[in-house]
Amino acid sequence: MCTHTGHSAAPSLSGLIDAEPCHFWLPLMPNEPTDVLPPTSFNVPFGTRPGIAALGERFFTRLSPTPLPSPYLVSVAPAAAALLGWNETDLQDAVKDPAFIDSFVGNAVPDWADPLATVYSGHQFGVWAGQLGDGRAIRLAEAQTPGGPWEIQLKGGGLTPYSRMADGRAVLRSSIREYLCSEAMYALGVPTTRALSIIGSDAPVRRETIETSAVVTRLAPSFIRFGHFEHFAAREDHASLRQLADFVIDNFYPACRNAANPYQALLRDVSLLTADMVAHWQAVGFCHGVMNTDNMSILGLTIDYGPFGFLDAFDANHICNHSDQQGRYAYSQQPQVAFWNLHCLAQALLPLWRDANAADPEAEKAAAVEAAREALDPFRDRYAEAFFRHYRAKLGLRSEQEQDETLMTNLFRVLHENRVDYTSFWRNLSRVSSLDNSHDAAVRDLFLDRAAWDAWAAEYRARLQSEQSDDAARTTAMLATNPKYVLRNHMAETAIRAARDKDFSEVDRLMAVLSKPFDEQPEAESYAKLPPDWASGLEVSCSS
């Protein structure tokens, strides 16, 4: 969800904890189903389990998706389908069955499905926004597979009781971007939700202009967000809040159950996974664009691909979201924003270890706040450890040395000053020699100030020589760490323009290339080139 409602500085934990409870939610809608869709018998290679439906109807509304006229398959992702048990041969047979399209666009409800929309709230651009969703995402079912549970969700599946003033739809443009980036991020090794398919329709929807509709089928072990906890905390519904936390602990963080304070342990573990995720974003040059608390996964997964972007020319303060005029979610701000969002989660969870009958309420409150601080304290160290681990690997360094932070700081400075293409830099750096500048040309040519490269390269070579780096082994390791292919905005735009004319070949071509981002792929060399001049004029925003 992406709504620009303002901007605020990150408060301290005590500031959040001490704030008055928020009461700006919309009332829950009556839990009544929409018109019942025709059932369909569509065989799938997985069983199902209740998942979040076991919590009861305070957490969701059962409903049917809203059908789309004349749906058509845009693309299906074999790697994501494999999570549900389809091999490539069976998948090709499955997509030929009209029931596949009907099931995953929302035109019929399979006999194994239990569609519902969950309720959550959250902070958007630093401001409490009240109840937010699910406004257009409908959980179709929760698959039970040998690899664990996979929640199957239709994004763009139609109106829900939580749609507010929106239409419940997603457009083809944004659906292609989310579909491709979900699978690209997985291939890069970044924790992420997955994407099974896109199904389109010529049904018109109004955004800045009239566009056509699409539904992305998304997969994740769970789509529970920070905002789910914020919703019940804001309503002071502590029983439901505890029930939700227990569900998450029992299903995803079972080790927390053995802690003296399981809910504090949950907060700590979520913060650690969030730190890992954001450090990985920084390393691959990914900018999320709209890190609202309702877009933060309780499992530390990248979720809700909207106005995202990968860095082209390196700018530490890059803003990928045209709607983010003040740069709250700029590339350099992502770690701090993640920490701010964790403070919001801490505030939501705090009632779970408060004692309403304490003899000394002030002392009890201080102790509860301190427990929250203790849970969040490891975030900074965990983020720093993950950050330096990723960048040492990107630099081909096998050991930790005291000067590494200075080496990296100097590198980021010259990359920023020269607006060096981020992905191309790291890929070409993988092949430089530790002994001389004989293999420097490809990376040196990326710099406007060649002397700046020469100075930093001398520093880098000295560092490599200090650990007697073997160039061949180092190059192999760096090429497996520094991708050749990422989903640049102009690549997605090219696929979108073709798809508007019902040519989906570029979507499938990109999916194939991005599924092997570290491989050379000579036939895909054009996707590794610097962005064309027209790409600088592309803007992405919250419109989806």
Curated annotation (Swiss-Prot):
Spell out where the chain crosses the membrane.
Answer: none
- Which molecular function GO terms apply here? AMPylase activity; ATP binding; magnesium ion binding
Pfam family membership, one: SelO
Keyword annotations for this protein, in alphabetical order, are: ATP-binding, Magnesium, Manganese, Metal-binding, Nucleotide-binding, Nucleotidyltransferase, Transferase
Q: Per UniProt, where does Mg(2+) bind?
A: 295, 304
Name the reaction it catalyses: L-seryl-[protein] + ATP = 3-O-(5'-adenylyl)-L-seryl-[protein] + diphosphate; L-threonyl-[protein] + ATP = 3-O-(5'-adenylyl)-L-threonyl-[protein] + diphosphate; L-tyrosyl-[protein] + ATP = O-(5'-adenylyl)-L-tyrosyl-[protein] + diphosphate; L-histidyl-[protein] + UTP = N(tele)-(5'-uridylyl)-L-histidyl-[protein] + diphosphate
Q: Which cofactor does it need?
A: Mg(2+); Mn(2+)
Q: What is its EC number?
A: 2.7.7.-, 2.7.7.108
Q: Which residues form the active site?
A: 294
InterPro entries per record: SelO (IPR003846)
Query: Residues that bind ATP, according to the entry?
Result: 133, 135-136, 155, 167-168, 218, 225, 304
Q: Does the keyword Cell inner membrane apply?
A: no
- Name the source's superkingdom: Bacteria
HAMAP family assigned: YdiU_SelO
UniProt xrefs under PANTHER family: PROTEIN ADENYLYLTRANSFERASE SELO, MITOCHONDRIAL
Q: Which family does it belong to?
A: Belongs to the SELO family.
Kindly give the NCBIfam families that the UniProt entry links to this protein: PRK00029.1
Function of this protein? Nucleotidyltransferase involved in the post-translational modification of proteins. It can catalyze the addition of adenosine monophosphate (AMP) or uridine monophosphate (UMP) to a protein, resulting in modifications known as AMPylation and UMPylation.
Q: Which protein are we looking at? A: Protein nucleotidyltransferase YdiU
